[in-house]
From Swiss-Prot:
Keyword Glycosyltransferase: no
Signal peptide: 1-21
Broad class of enzyme this protein falls into: hydrolase
Gene responsible for this protein: SCPL11
Chain positions carrying an annotated carbohydrate: 101, 342, 374
Intrachain S-S bonds: 80-322, 243-257, 281-288
Expression tissues: Ubiquitous.
Cellular component annotations (GO), alphabetically ordered: extracellular region
Coiled-coil intervals: none
GO molecular function, a single term: serine-type carboxypeptidase activity
Identification of the protein by name: Serine carboxypeptidase-like 11
Source organism (scientific name): Arabidopsis thaliana
């Protein structure tokens, strides 16, 4: 009996160590043959009782894992799985856009994965996103600031289990709503590095694409739409005069402004706001360029895929790519601008980039809050090039901040994978764009 108990305890220890340390994935359903890169998946327990289990995908750099930087990538939402980044933006795999026939959707290799120059952790956060879950009902509604602390704890524990990466330069990154989380996380890590008993994280900076930053961001949709010839000069001048720059939190008594804003929506509501040049199409249609967003649900909910990824049994029900409409969440960070200021003062590098055809977070909104920081301009506005072709425009500021546009791209980087990869590679290597 005593021997049986000892064996049981040993087995539980091995299993827990196996889960906590992550599992190597060599094959994935839908991909032909062994994976051409090193993938690890796993959970890190958060909290005193480790009741929150955050799921991650870790992919080693294809260049030099020992020397290349470590990047934590967070998807937006809030509540979108980080598989959005892995399969649709900057990872080494993509879903093949072919008509769903009931079998596991196919995966193909990508050419311009950011893992060619960095080790990347794709983290499902907040709790409840992707394959992350809580063992017990949450007492409090997840919040921006609460998730920042959880992600910080995740990083500390992940690095303690992967000490070989503790000396690598560390960067945080993400897009869209991660524009609220990442700057706060960088500040949290920076402060945490001064606490005596925690091993310091070798923090160097952060990268953000089309980041939501301030509640005023939507006000820039109207001047952006005018500049893109989506609304007439007459409507723009009238709405600017009537609304005084406040277009999306209008005083109900300002009926003239409200009526003009309604006219604006009539001109733009049928556009694809994530990329104004792309069709506004149904993702369930095989003809839609976003059809892979429809296929991902079949892939991630297939039992063979979950087994291959080592997803804990019965941890979640149906997997959703984004669950921000079905899960409660408190957005308690109203502006991330103060965090940008603090991080710059602390000496951290930052790359802020914008797809110039995004109506959700127009590049004008990003330029406006960067301008509000009052940083000196080190390198004036200029085109950045790939093989003698203009691929965007860039400006470098004091306090190590770089702003860049990606010409022809939308809300996320997948629209221009080559350009976004080369931009990231140059910046992460300390080269001018």
């Amino acid at each position: 009996m005593e021997l049986t108990l000892k064996l049981l305890v040993l087995l539980l220890f091995i299993l827990n160590h196996h889960v906590g340390s992550g599992s190597i994935v060599k094959f994935l359903p839908g991909f032909e043959g062994p994976l051409p890169f090193e993938l690890e998946t796993g959970y890190i327990g958060i909290g005193e009782e480790e009741e929150v289990q955050l799921f991650y995908y870790f992919i080693k750099s294809e260049r030099n894992p020992k020397e290349d930087p470590l990047l934590l990538w967070l998807s937006g939402g809030p509540g979108c799985s980080s598989i959005t980044g892995l399969l649709f933006q900057n990872g080494p795999l993509a879903l093949k856009s072919e008509v769903y026939n009931g079998s596991v959707p196919s995966l193909v290799s990508t050419t311009y994965s950011w893992t060619k120059t960095a080790n990347i952790i794709f983290l499902d956060q907040p709790v409840g996103a992707g394959f992350s879950y809580s063992r017990a009902p949450l007492i409090d509604t997840p919040t921006d600031t609460g998730e920042v602390k959880r992600i910080h704890e995740f990083l500390q524990k992940w690095l303690s289990k992967h000490p070989q990466f503790s000396s690598n330069h560390f960067y945080a990154g993400g897009d869209s709503y991660s524009g609220m989380i990442v700057p706060a996380l960088v500040q949290e890590i920076s402060k945490g590095n001064y606490i005596c008993c925690n091993p310091p994280i070798n923090l160097k900076g952060y990268v953000l694409g089309n980041p939501i930053t301030h509640e005023d961001d939507p006000n820039y949709r109207i001047p952006f739409s005018h500049g893109m010839a989506l609304i007439s000069d007459e409507l723009y001048e009238s709405i600017r005069e009537a609304c005084k720059g406040n277009y999306f939190n209008v005083d109900p008594r300002n009926t003239k402004c409200l009526k003009l804003v309604e006219e604006f929506h009539k001109c733009t509501d049928k556009l694809n706001e994530f990329h104004i040049l792309s069709p506004d199409c149904d993702t369930a249609s095989p003809d839609c360029y976003l059809y892979p967003f429809y296929l991902i649900s079949f892939w991630a909910n297939d039992e063979s895929v979950r087994d291959a990824l080592h997803v804990n049994k019965r941890s979640i029900g149906k997997w959703e790519r984004c669950n921000y409409l079905s899960k409660p969440y408190n957005k308690d960070i109203k502006s991330s601008v103060p965090y940008h200021m603090n991080n710059s003062v602390s000496g951290y590098r930052s790359l802020i980039y914008s797809g110039d055809h995004d109506l959700v977070v127009p590049f004008l909104a990003t330029q406006a809050w960067i301008k509000s920081l009052n940083y000196s301009i080190i390198d004036e506005w200029r085109p950045w090039m790939i093989r003698d072709q203009i691929t965007g425009y860039t400006r470098t500021y004091s306090n190590k901040m770089t702003f860049a546009t990606v010409k022809g791209s939308g809300h996320t980087a997948e629209n221009k994978p080559q350009e976004s990869f080369i931009m990231f590679r140059r910046w992460i290597n300390g080269q001018p764009l």
